[in-house]
Amino acid sequence: MMPRRFAAFAMCATLITSCTRVQTAGPGGRHQWTQPHILRVADISEPDHFNPLLSTMDLVYFLDSLVFSFLIIADDHGKLIGDLATEVPTLRNGGISNDGRTYTYHLRRDVRWHDGAPFTAADVKFTWQAVINPNNNTLHREGYDRIARIDTPDKYTVVLHLKRRYPPLVTRFFTPLQEGVKGILPAHLLAGLHDINQIPFNSHPIGTGPFKFSSWERGRRIVLLRNDYYYKGRPKLNEIIFNVIPDDNSVLNAVRVHDIDLVTTPPPVLYEQYKALPDVSVSLAPWNAQNILILNQRRPQLHDLAVRKAISMAIDYNSIISKIEHGVGTIPHDIVPEQSIGYTNNPSYRYDPAAARAVLDHAGWRPAPDGIRQKAGQRLDFVIHASAGSANGRLIATFLQPALRAVGMNLDIKMYPYNVIFSHEGPLYTFKYDLADYSLTLPYDPDNLFYYGCDYWFPKGENIYGICDAAFDRLEKAGLQTDDPAQRAKLYHQAEREFHNSVGIIPLYNLRRPVAHNPDLRNFSTAPASAPWWNAWQWDI
């Protein structure tokens, strides 16, 4: 899981197929090791539970997208399409009112829960109430808390009344598009409970998705069975088995001996080894996520734009991608994904240490005898914080040390356990850091005010960077005053350019999702979403 915060997103991946050797075919032309219509998946982690309202684990997002359903999803090209809703609400189709405060969702009439009960508007209303219920340990209420009330005039109509206009709502209300994936829960089973934090449902879920929960042998495997009554059609797979394998190298070996058909989380360091496996197809799926270097602008030195610019020019981004990401990452140009209406193809930050030194010279930062620059009694002496559980985090921090030293800055490294560095009492959320490196998901909608706005410093929002850019704020706020995509796009293009030029954060690389699979797997593609498995009912093997 990544903070945010982490939308994982991918267009249908182009396969990069490794060398193959001739094998005796099994039934239907399959390889001998393929089990017809049974997909074996592996991951090094195990879910904490299955409740889509309570977890922030990427694996839970994946599993829940098979068991539960959403109102709106994205296809493999990033286009929004209806799932439980028959269409995406827009101004043009009347789903969004002219004042932007009323949203109407029309629901499918052919959906049943795995226990046979009908799915209705009451389920949507109940799940929203569960999200905003303070007794539930729900994270990421952003968007849901903008709703004043929900009406259900009939079983298949849901009407949202917002407290005020909020254009990102469609991309955040029961969608799998970004961090905080939330599927719809069954009201007939859960309504009336004080909370849903510790209930049997969380380990034996009932959903409306293409596969239904069968069993969970903790520490070993999870079995999902085909939902014969799935509303989009009978799934082609009979069974999906999730195998819990404790480490990445063991997963690689399981793929090598063909005990596993699909791995969607192999680390970049093993990417070349996966590509070298015979009879295994390997792809790189674009993913709406970034690794970023954040700068605490509450520190006087980092509040200086010249210092932030110099840091951005001291970094060799291509070397990070080739040496640390093993070619899996790509150069970033914006802090929103390419599918977003606000995406702006900014020039990438350039690697130019000489220019970085010149910028600092011009701003009055002069080298001391030890080579570290100083000005008015302040030194460019920093500490970078990273997660002790992230191999890439340590590698990046180590990579940055000589890079910053070359332009007159000192950088020490401090590693924290994952649950400490991202705790609300940890160094990031208490602004007790200089620099930090981590990965996050990019929001599908270009609205970033909650993360970078002047009024949203934590705990009022998720601005843990000390950023306050008046021009950026003005443009972001204007983008929330209209639901017209064309008008919003113009405003967010300006906002993205302003943020880029002010070096609010430094994106180091865009992530891509390595995927390794049995070449007998058919119709598999990933979507630009935190829960990327948008068409699992069509998969077959």
Feature roles, as predicted:
Residues 22, 131, 149-150, 214-225, ...:
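Extracellular/periplasmic solute-recognition and catalytic clefts
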Residues 73-79, 177-235, 239, 249, ...:
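Gly/Pro-rich hinge or "lid" segments in bacterial periplasmic/extracellular proteins
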Residues 88-137, 159, 254, 301-303:
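Aromatic- and charge-enriched surface segment that lines or borders ligand/interaction sites
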Residues 141-191:
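Surface-exposed binding/hinge segments that line
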